[in-house]
Amino acid sequence: MHRRGVGAGAIAKKKLAEAKYKERGTVLAEDQLAQMSKQLDMFKTNLEEFASKHKQEIRKNPEFRVQFQDMCATIGVDPLASGKGFWSEMLGVGDFYYELGVQIIEVCLALKHRNGGLITLEELHQQVLKGRGKFAQDVSQDDLIRAIKKLKALGTGFGIIPVGGTYLIQSVPAELNMDHTVVLQLAEKNGYVTVSEIKASLKWETERARQVLEHLLKEGLAWLDLQAPGEAHYWLPALFTDLYSQEITAEEAREALP
């Protein structure tokens, strides 16, 4: 027996049903979007009330400030996005991170002749705290990272390089690719690295290792020690702390400014 073909009426009915399902789906999606938008507005209002109530604690307590920033991030609010507006006027965070950014630049410039423009986050944190004095608003490493990201967005040459369990802060516009970053990570343990160590650990050819090290030397990020036993050592001054035993004075920071 031959199967009967589907009639025009059945096809039209099927298309009508599909159109209704599609229309219903659109209505549901719009309802969900409206509900989410309403919840988001309510959450933002509650966040503003929370900020108003706890603004002193947000400004003074670094840990509390981190938690507040995370709360803001969940709804896409960035208190640092502008120097003006509700958040900066209420909390003063715009001015806080602007001033912190200026201080970071001053410290990095003052130390540039020692470290070539690379400094660990821990060392930067210590130097910033020294410069602020004991009566100034407390600053956390998270605050530093947020301020540096703002500096980076301005095209100032600042960057953040993950190294082991910490970060190196780059304050010069040197171009560093993945090879350079891997070598910096390798040098973290001793503060220096050799061509042989790179070849053994990373399985690189000699020329590749030399090119990376020569670039770091050229950018002033590494020092070459030809008197070291065995073979030349390439020291990364940002990774050893003997150079930072002296506190940076205010005069030294000012002299470093252009």
UniProtKB/Swiss-Prot annotation:
One of its GO terms (biological process) is endocytic recycling. Residues 27-53 form a coiled coil. Keywords: Coiled coil, Cytoplasm, Disease variant, Endosome, Epilepsy, Intellectual disability, Membrane, Methylation, Nucleus, Protein transport, Transcription, Transcription regulation, Transport. One of its GO terms (molecular function) is protein homodimerization activity. PANTHER family: EAP30 SUBUNIT OF ELL COMPLEX, VACUOLAR-SORTING PROTEIN SNF8. Component of the endosomal sorting complex required for transport II (ESCRT-II), composed of SNF8, VPS25 and VPS36. SNF8 is essential for the stability of the ESCRT-II complex. ESCRT-II interacts with ELL. Interacts with TSG101 (via the C-terminal domain). Interacts with RILPL1 (via the N-terminal domain); which recruits ESCRT-II to the endosome membranes. Interacts with 14-3-3 proteins. It is linked to Developmental and epileptic encephalopathy 115: A form of epileptic encephalopathy, a heterogeneous group of early-onset epilepsies characterized by refractory seizures, neurodevelopmental impairment, and poor prognosis. Development is normal prior to seizure onset, after which cognitive and motor delays become apparent. DEE115 is an autosomal recessive, severe form characterized by onset soon after birth. Affected individuals show massive reduction of white matter, hypo- or aplasia of the corpus callosum, and neurodevelopmental arrest. Death in the first year of life may occur. Neurodevelopmental disorder plus optic atrophy: An autosomal recessive disorder characterized by mild developmental delay, intellectual disability and childhood-onset optic atrophy or ataxia. Component of the endosomal sorting complex required for transport II (ESCRT-II), which is required for multivesicular body (MVB) formation and sorting of endosomal cargo proteins into MVBs, and plays a role in autophagy. The MVB pathway mediates delivery of transmembrane proteins into the lumen of the lysosome for degradation. The ESCRT-II complex is probably involved in the recruitment of the ESCRT-III complex. The ESCRT-II complex may also play a role in transcription regulation by participating in derepression of transcription by RNA polymerase II, possibly via its interaction with ELL. This is Vacuolar-sorting protein SNF8. It comes from Homo sapiens (Human).
